Amino acid sequence: MSDIKQLLKEAKQELTNRDYEETIEISEKVLKLDPDNYFAHIFLGKALSSLPASNNVSSNRNLERATNHYVSAAKLVPDNLLAWKGLFLLFRTTEVVPDILSYDEYFDLCGQYADALLKQEQSQVELINDIKLLKKTHPDCQKAFYQHLKPGSLMAETIGRHLSTPQDALLNLIKILSNIETTEIGKTLSQNRLKLKASDPDYQIKLNSFSWEIIKNSEIDQLYNQLVNILADDQKRSEIENQWLEYRIKVLKSMPLDVKKDFFTKVKEMVEDMVLVNHQSLLAWQKYFEWTDYEDLDNMDAPLIIKYFKKFPKDPLAMILYSWLSSKLSKYDIKSLESANKPPEGHKKTEKETDIKDVDETNEDEVKDRVEDEVKDRVEDEVKDQDEEAKEDEEEDLDDIEIGLLEEEVVTVLTENIVKCKNNILAHRILCQYYLLTKEYEAALPYIKNGISLIAYNIKDLGVHLPLTKREFSLDLATVYTYVDAPKDHNAALKLYDNILSGDFSNIQAKMGKGIIFIERKNWKDAMTLLTQVHEQSPNNLEVLSELSWSKAHMGYMDEALAGLDTVIKGIKGMDLRSIDFRALNLWRQAKVYIMKHASINDAKQENVKCAFKLLIQSIKILDTFAPGFSTLGDIYCHYYKDHLRAFKCYFKAFDLDAGDYTAAKYITETYASKPNWQAASSIASRLIKGEKAKAELRSNNWPFRVVGIAHLEKQEESDSIEWFQSALRVDPNDVESWVGLGQAYHACGRIEASIKVFDKAIQLRPSHTFAQYFKAISLCDVGEYLESLDILEKVCQEAATEESFQIGLVEVLMRCSLDLYSQGFLLKSVSIAKDTIERIKIIISELKCENQQVWIYLSQVLRLFIWIESKVDTLPVESLVSIFENSQFSGSEEIDSVDNIKIDTLLDSTTDDNVSIACKFLILASKYSVSDQKFTDIAGTVRASYWYNIGISELTAFITLKEPQYRDAAIFAFKKSIQLQSNTSETWIGLGIATMDINFRVSQHCFIKATALEPKATNTWFNLAMLGLKKKDTEFAQQVLNKLQSLAPQDSSPWLGMALILEEQGDIIGSSKLFAHSFILSNGRSKAAQFMYAKNVLENHINNGDDERDIETVEKLTTASIALEQFFKKSPDSQFALQCALLTLERLHHYENANELANRLIGILEKKFEKTQDERELFNFAIIKGQFARIHLGLGNFELSIENADLSQGIISESSDEKSMKTKISNHICLGLSYFFLNDFDQTLNQFQELLSISKDSKHLVVLIAKVLYDVGESDTKEIALQELTEYIATSGADLLVTLTIAAMSILDDKREDLSIILEELKALPLSKQIIDKHKDAPYLIEEITKRLYRNDTGKQVWQRSAYFFPNNLKVWERLDKNIQRRIASNGQNKVTAEEMSKLYCESKNLRSIQRGMFLCPWNVTAVKALNECF
């Protein structure tokens, strides 16, 4: 022992001398002798902490050893402060904490040091300051710091009050641990989430297991428990308890299933305790109600709900619960509940209770404000309806309204707040119960499914055990399956009931549900059997007895059913809405049983019906919103009392209350449709379709869809009607009426082909359906199938001869067919059909007495057709038209009659009118008669405007046709009237512009400009404006307008025709000719103006132009002009100028027979005009035509008639000396000379030729003609004279190709060799310009012939070779050289060849294929036929 003391003295001395190494060595020797030596540990701690760092040992190692020795010394003698002071001096001067010593170890030592200081009654200030400094400089020590300040720890008990309150310490520790826990859970989940499949059913459970690994060792729950127990502030404790509950629910979700159940019990007990003490935690209240497994929603703790609602009036769950209490469908009396919940007056409360009351009153005020806002309008309405004298009752009613909610507001609150309670089971259960009680099964379905999912989620996540709620949702789902989409889901409903019964065999609701399914299936026997068993099991259940009695009634046990229902009615005691509804239902069932009983016994006195009637009245008095009562009452009025007005009212009331009442809806719809009021019928049908209760009926009855479709057709909303008709056909594909309606909709939407197919389907289903055939015919007409359409309509009209619509439809198709034929150029056929149309109209007006406006419009169209085709106006059925107008009532149109004076009486009295004039007057009358069946002033303004427009068009047509000014004035008057009534119609402005074109240029221009503003793309407006400009010689303006028109309608012939007229006016003959031809081609030769202008232009280009008759191109153009004029004459047969053009054309084409007919017609027209006017100009024109007629007779070989006409013409114009007269005189002399020549009167022939030469010696054609005639006489002297005339012409006028060729031909015929040599040289020396003129190569031919006669060889072939060099594409040249090349050139289209010539060329190849081509080109070619025969 003395050695130890000595060593300690030495160590102390060395320590004083700061020889730390020696101190360490001595102290270690002491510890070897005495391991628990207090001072040795202190000396070692001091020395080691003071020892500087060396190469072998680090300073941290020394500090660690020093710390351990200080701690060891403190543990050996805790009450000795020396070691503690050295240790904490070390802590203060070095970074031992936290580098060597952890925070937990440090704070443990702090607690022990504080305890030693306390025992020694020493100051703790320095220690406290050290702790605070450490906390400040080392923020990461917070967790350990607060861990050691938990109540019960040594540090907390000694110096905790100086550092923090226990409440703050626990609260801060909870926050720190919660943050750490949340961070670790998030990190773990992010690491493992991707390792799991989201589709895995246990995905969430597996994720929770990762969280549980972190949470299971957590002390947060215990800390919350400690904190709650020590909190004195109620509000603070309430907040902490709410946080604790949230944490516990979080822990509950992460727990494994095996431990979740026990912990859920703890959490649930905590929630119940919190609610018991009226806790401020909203979550606790929500979970309390959600986790309470109510057997019946009518047995909830209503006062507690009121309390909950007043505490949290804005909470969605509270509002839903309160609305359920307020609903008339629940068993609660909200008024009594509210009254019982009010505190008694004068009750004294403590200060704390007063504060709570203030809060409750504030909440109550919020509730009232909320309720008052929702029912404000209804309160005002109720107050207004009260009697002013009952002021006290009014105030009481107002108070009643303020308590609870109205039923409409209940629905609003439920539907609005369920969105905010998506995860609350009880909220879904309440809403589902409400929907089921109101029989809105389809609306309940999604909430039932959500509720079942929420239960499964709560069981899996929280371990919630709600067997009763789960059973109720299963029953609700089965109930919905019973009624929604029945009977599709009946099997699913039965399985649900069986599952419930497997766990609870005595469940009355499940058994009753199965019975109701049997009732819905009309399986009354099984229903009665099952419900009998249920009734025996529960004899006091009135619902079971009611359903059983209803089943017995349908099985024929009427008396038993009535007795059972009477028992049910007597057993109903409650006065809530459900009880009242149940009483009304059973009274209705009794009434139905009486009606069934009446039907089974056929009671003539209708006693049972009277009983049923009384019961129904009673049920309606009990519950005026019971729809089946009104519906059945309607049945009685309709079928038994025959009072259809009251039946309609009852049905309407029933349907107003229940949009799913199929019987009421059908009766109301049929009533509206019979009026017809399709819009009202559609509204009823639409409501029936939208309602879910009638879906079972709508699976087999499609009339509601058809009614809605028809209503859309009536509103001209055809595209919307299509889907309704399609829906109707999905229900019943054999419904003909729906097919017809669908076809009409397709037709109106422009889908004509589809409509035809649909009508075919309807006809296939019912061939006798006349309307389907009628509509098909109309559709066929729209696609241009007029013949098939007419065949169908003829049959339909025969089957239903008195149906006006069919007859009018036939007239329409006939009219459209005739117009279509007219547009295609089939004018005569068009007129024929127009006549049939008039006869049909006669039947409609005379026999059917129908004066539909459309009929008069159709009559106007066909009459206009006769005016357009004047050649057939004599076939106009005047007698039928007279009959039509005489059988029509016409009040007269004095305004227009005073202008045109057209009436049926004046028309019949007139004897001077021609056929065209009569047709025009009938056209005007047809326009006037179009509104003769009603008072004109009562018609809508737009209709009157169209009436005046139709009259204006008819008057304008008459003016254009007859050129009589009174019709123009009448047209202007009518158009102005139409514009006054409706000024936004471009057609009226166009008509007025045309009518005023000859009167006032500015007015006409204004009208056309107005029309273009209203309808900028209307081509006829621009064309008329251009013609107006051209009429005023403003070609530049007209050209600009036509350019605009060409951009709008380049395929239209009108702008091209206008451009041609402009170019003609400007003198561009070539350009105008091309455009006239282009316009004629674009119109397909059907435009009247294009026909006439093209023919005129062709004649201007080819008359007096020296064209050879052998030119195919000229003949082609003249032939086309002839055809154009032929079509023109069908429309305007008496056009004088057109007839003259046609005579010229036919004369050039040598069609003398046709020309003769036209000449006779033209002469007759001129004679009539001359007789009527006695105008010398008409006589002059007559003479000109007579001269032309003489040429036609000359062509026909009628020489004497030719002489007669020529003499007559010559006599009339003998004194005239103008150019036209001189041409006619020359023509007359030629006709006379040639006629006398062919009549062998040579003297007269010579006289006429001498006269001819005296008039004109400059015409080479006249000289050649005379020479040919003289040469043809055959006398040598006449031949000499002929040659002499030709040579004289050459001497005076110079060399001419025609004259030279004529001399050559005469010389060849006379075989004058001395002259032939000279002529040959002249022909060979012809310049190239003359050879170009010689298109038919007459010169090479004559050279060849002369060569043969002079040299007797084929050297003349060289001239053809030379011509081939200059003219390689000339067929005549290659005809002499090579037939194959000639055929190839002809077939390549390089030359115009007639079909017969081409056919001959093909036949000459002696090839079968070529011969067949020749036959195809020209079947009348005899040569081709012979060649083809030779091939076989």
Curated annotation (Swiss-Prot):
One of its GO terms (cellular component) is nucleus. One of its GO terms (biological process) is nuclear-transcribed mRNA catabolic process, non-stop decay. Residues 344-381 have a biased composition (Basic and acidic residues). InterPro entries: Ski3/TTC37, TPR-like_helical_dom_sf, TPR_22, TPR_rpt. Residues 339-397 are annotated as: Disordered. TPR repeats lie at residues 4-37, 47-80, 425-458, 471-507, 508-541, 627-661, 702-735, 736-769, 945-985, 987-1018, 1226-1259. Residues 382-397 have a biased composition (Acidic residues). Component of the SKI complex composed of at least SKI2, SKI3 and SKI8. The SKI complex interacts with SKI7, which makes the link between the SKI complex and the exosome in order to perform mRNA degradation. PANTHER family: SUPERKILLER 3 PROTEIN-RELATED (PTHR15704), SUPERKILLER COMPLEX PROTEIN 3 (PTHR15704:SF7). This is Superkiller protein 3. It comes from Saccharomyces cerevisiae (strain ATCC 204508 / S288c). The lineage of its organism: Eukaryota, Fungi, Dikarya, Ascomycota, Saccharomycotina.
